[in-house]
Amino acid sequence: MKKIFAVYYERDVNELGQLYPKIEDRQFNEVLFDIRDTLAKKNIDFVLITRQNPYVGNGEFFGYWQPGDNFCYKKVDELIKPDLIHDKGHIDFSDGFLNFFNSHDFARLGRNKYTQAVLAEGFIPRTCLVCSEKGYDKVLKNIKSEQIVAKPLDLNGGNGVTLYNRNNLNENQSFPIIMQEFVETSGGIDGMVNGRHDIRLYIIDGEAVMCSIRQPKEGGWLSNTHQGGTIHFYNKSEINPELLKFAQPVIEKFDQFGGKFYSIDFMRGNDGWYMIEMNDRPGMPAFFQDTNGAVKEFHEKLAAMITKELA
């Protein structure tokens, strides 16, 4: 009997069977079909489960979405019991019968940037937790950079991230937030990238298997693709060895919380490497973004890990 691998999203499939109907979201549509095709070679079924499919207990959901033609899904109204779930929506229910890619402890860690900063102290820019305007005095005392980055604790994709001058911190900020030292990355990385950047390492079973280099649009500082940044992918042999050495103890810190697949973002400042943050449910590249075989190799390693987890 075939094993079932499911990806769960906290969003709806529309009446046309589309999960991501916008053209600019092509990556998020196609990557799921790429995963389906890769897993099919290993005799594993892929299904999509969304918040439209209620959990009924004992590891079962009522209804699921079967990949169809033209990157659309067909609704199936029957019970399904996935053998393994990749949670892209932060499922907050479990009766002990659901088997997740990453543990719940790891998912909670992914939702709290301050907890990540405490765990990665010494690897991450100087960080302060700010719960009210009274916390600004602590920020100015501990962070010396002229510019200061403010981030919500639980958002990704550059959403809610703001850059302030230290003399003009926003009194209308929503709390709690973290505030961090701003690290200038315009010096780039020899042999890899010129100018401002961040580098994302994709971690599978404790190993950095691929990286992406993202750069902001001209004049910008946020490199997230939804913020107008560009992205290119590289296989492990192309990753800067200094970064791999710097990243290894960081990976070990996060692995102890039960992460099987995740990403960590890094940057190189004028005085060395820094971790930015960990993402417990990173966006995955689709085959159409592959220019050098790195994405195909990533999918094969991901499928191998899924196969091992289902054995």
Task: Label each PLM-derived region with a short phrase.
Residues 157-238:
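Phosphate-binding site of ATP-dependent enzymes
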Residues 1-6:
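Extreme N-terminal starter segment of soluble prokaryotic enzymes
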Residues 7-24:
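Short glycine-rich His-centered loop
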Residues 23-131:
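Conserved N-proximal alpha/beta basic substrate-recognition cap immediately N-terminal to
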Residues 200-201, 263-265:
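Short, surface-exposed charged micro-motifs
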Residues 241, 255-261, 268-311:
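C-terminal active-site "lid" helix and adjoining low-complexity regulatory extension at the edge
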Residues 148, 209-210, 274-277:
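Protein kinase-like catalytic core scaffold
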Residues 91-97, 102-192, 244:
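Active-site nucleotide/adenylate-binding loops and adjacent lid/helix of ATP-dependent enzymes
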